[in-house]
Amino acid sequence: MNPDNTIAVITETIPIGMQFDKVYLSTFNMWREILSNTTKTLDISSFYWSLSDEVGTNFGTIILNEIVQLPKRGVRVRVAVNKSNKPLKDVERLQMAGVEVRYIDITNILGGVLHTKFWISDNTHIYLGSANMDWRSLTQVKELGIAIFNNRNLAADLTQIFEVYWYLGVNNLPYNWKNFYPSYYNTDHPLSINVSGVPHSVFIASAPQQLCTMERTNDLTALLSCIRNASKFVYVSVMNFIPIIYSKAGKILFWPYIEDELRRSAIDRQVSVKLLISCWQRSSFIMRNFLRSIAMLKSKNIDIEVKLFIVPDADPPIPYSRVNHAKYMVTDKTAYIGTSNWTGNYFTDTCGASINITPDDGLGLRQQLEDIFMRDWNSKYSYELYDTSPTKRCKLLKNMKQCTNDIYCDEIQPEKEIPEYSLE
């Protein structure tokens, strides 16, 4: 690694069995690259750990073993993980190896979870993306993230978010806690970096607002700004898109901020909008009608489209896998790579983060993300909302083996809606 240059790389996991003409550096290989070059410190923010319970490959075990070896090399490793009611044997193994671990009880503080997924190596290199510390995220779940090397300024800014989590692992929030962990960059004052000789503006946003310092851009604000600043197109690839908040009392509340901004951009400014939403057996049924209402806007003067992305099943099936888990957006100006699903609670009471990058020439990383989106959009794994699915993989499409007519299929009753955090 050349310490004089910032290097930024898009990473992805393509589930075993899926085929594309072009793929980018794998999450597995990128994580190994980071681990092999870590010499002093490694901080990891994680939702949960399940690297060792794998089937068919040993990618997860390799990553876990390499992390376990770091303390023996004199590396200080800190892991912030969402507090769970179930024991995490991977985490217990980390602790036995000398890794410092803190369980973060966001549920008790805000009602949500610690859903942020990022790494910080040697206070210089970072990874942020959709991949969990789960073997499935290396072989069986479609993931997307970004690694940025050799930039201490950006790493220091992300470390401030980690330090907030780390503090929450042992303390309640003090009255003036926001003075402890200031942010250095935001949407109004982004960091200027050079990637491959091209100037880029970049900042890291965080959610929820309650855990943002005065200087930190809230993730929702960053997301909406990205949409508003687009002049030609907005392409979105996320696991869930539901304009709903699930309240603690079990009620659902309408939360239209993202949907309204997308509709407004398509209608008022004639921006082309494409939504590529994941579909599998655990998809929330309520999402179907929201997506259909958006797709119905398409007309001569309104360019807005919605597709569902289905990852083919494994044989034999593997629980909690085979889904497009990515959470990103790309416009003609900016690349937005996040860790949150686009459902209200992920922005109001759940911890998440995003990297927002705008290249001066409009190309580079932004172009790569656009290419990935269009590759997936035009692939055989993408379906129109009213297509008939050849399998039972997608809960939101009619299944040709079960549906004899449209009326029967459209009258399938949705199950009781509850927040889902497993895998997500």
UniProtKB/Swiss-Prot annotation:
Domain PLD phosphodiesterase: 110-137, 320-346
PROSITE patterns named in the record: PLD (PS50035)
Gene3D superfamilies: Endonuclease Chain A
InterPro entries for this protein: Diverse_PLD-related, PLDc_3, PLipase_D/transphosphatidylase
The keyword Hydrolase is annotated on this UniProt entry: yes
TM segment ranges: none
Induction description: Expressed in the intermediate phase of the viral replicative cycle.
Sorted UniProt keywords: Endonuclease, Hydrolase, Nuclease, Repeat, Virion
Compartment(s) of residence: Virion
Residues in the signal sequence: none
Main location: virion
GO molecular function list: endonuclease activity
Superkingdom of origin organism: Viruses
PANTHER family: 5'-3' EXONUCLEASE PLD3, PHOSPHOLIPASE D - RELATED
Family label: Belongs to the orthopoxvirus OPG042 family.
General function of this protein: DNA nicking enzyme that cleaves extruded cruciform DNA at its tip. Probably nicks viral hairpins.
Protein name: Virion nicking-joining enzyme
Organism: Vaccinia virus (strain Copenhagen)
Record lineage: Viruses, Varidnaviria, Bamfordvirae, Nucleocytoviricota, Pokkesviricetes
